Structure formats: C-alpha cells, structure tokens
C-alpha cells in the first residue's frame, strides 16, 4: 500500500522552496574569513619535490588556485576548471570526468609531437577546482560554469574546461 501512488494522499510533484536559506547553498562560496591568512598565489599540494604519483591529485599535477587573486599573483597562463556535469549525457557517469582526469596524474604529457613544445614547461598552469553544480538544473549549472570561466578570463588567464558531458 505504501509503495503505490494514491491521489489525494500523495503529491504528484515536489515543490522547491526558493525562499529557503538552503536553496542556493550548492553554489555559496566558503567565506575567506574561515581560511587562515596566506599570501595570494597558487598553492602546491605536493609533499615531495619529486612529485611522483602520491599526494592530492590535481589536473596536470599542477598547483591549485582558489581565487582570482591567486591567478593574478601567480601570473597564471592557463587555469583548468572541472565541470562535473552529466545531465545532458545518456551515460550518467560523465560527472566523474574531472575527478578521473585528476587521478591520472600524468602531468601535461610531455612535448607535443608536431611542435615539440611541452605546455607544462612553457605555460604556468593551475588547477582551479570544479565549478559548483546544481544537480536539479542544467541551466543553473551551466551558468555557474560560465561565471567561473568569466572569473578566470578576467584575470588574463586562459580557461581550460574539463567535463563531464556536453551540457
């Protein structure tokens, strides 16, 4: 009896309370006051100078930037942004794309075979984390990705987005 839908007893829709203080918490940024004071600039998460495969994974084994101030202070050329979306994909595991790319830990892969240029040696690259994703709205999620891309571009760095799907 509890498993069957019953008109009058069960609602046929779930309403979102857009007035709730928790409605937009998926994209509320952590207040800077909660973080210890530090000089602006990219943060290296590696414990060992040799790098290796241990430690906290980042895109291309690069340092992490948390804010536009970090991008400017670090004179960053390329900021890699994760966009873990899978709402427009028939395969619902695309959301794990950015995490999987970080876990590969292969750096930039060395020199390009056509140009013989190693982007990791000529560009200052950082991991800018993931854009916040609203699992209930592709539109709101894509807007958040756009906002992070704009935030990166306004510092003069080139945004490089790794998804997810093609939402």
Task: Tell where the protein language model's regions lie, with residue ranges.
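Metal-dependent C-N hydrolase catalytic cores
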Residues: 2-167
């Amino acid at each position: 009896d509890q498993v069957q839908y019953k008109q009058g007893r069960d609602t046929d829709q779930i309403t979102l309370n857009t007035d709730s203080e928790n409605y937009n918490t998926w994209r509320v940024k952590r207040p800077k006051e909660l973080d210890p004071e530090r000089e602006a600039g990219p943060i290296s998460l590696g414990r060992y100078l040799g790098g290796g495969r241990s430690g906290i994974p980042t895109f291309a084994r690069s340092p992490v930037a948390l804010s536009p101030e970090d991008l400017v202070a670090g004179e960053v050329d390329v900021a890699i942004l994760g966009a873990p979306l899978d709402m427009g994909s028939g395969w619902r595991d695309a959301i794990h794309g950015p995490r999987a790319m970080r876990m590969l830990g292969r750096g930039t892969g060395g020199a390009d075979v056509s140009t013989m240029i190693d982007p990791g040696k000529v560009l200052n690259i950082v991991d800018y984390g993931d854009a916040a994703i609203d699992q209930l709205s592709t539109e709101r999620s894509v807007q958040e990705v756009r906002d992070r891309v704009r935030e990166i571009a306004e510092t003069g760095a080139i945004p490089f987005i790794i998804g997810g799907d093609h939402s």
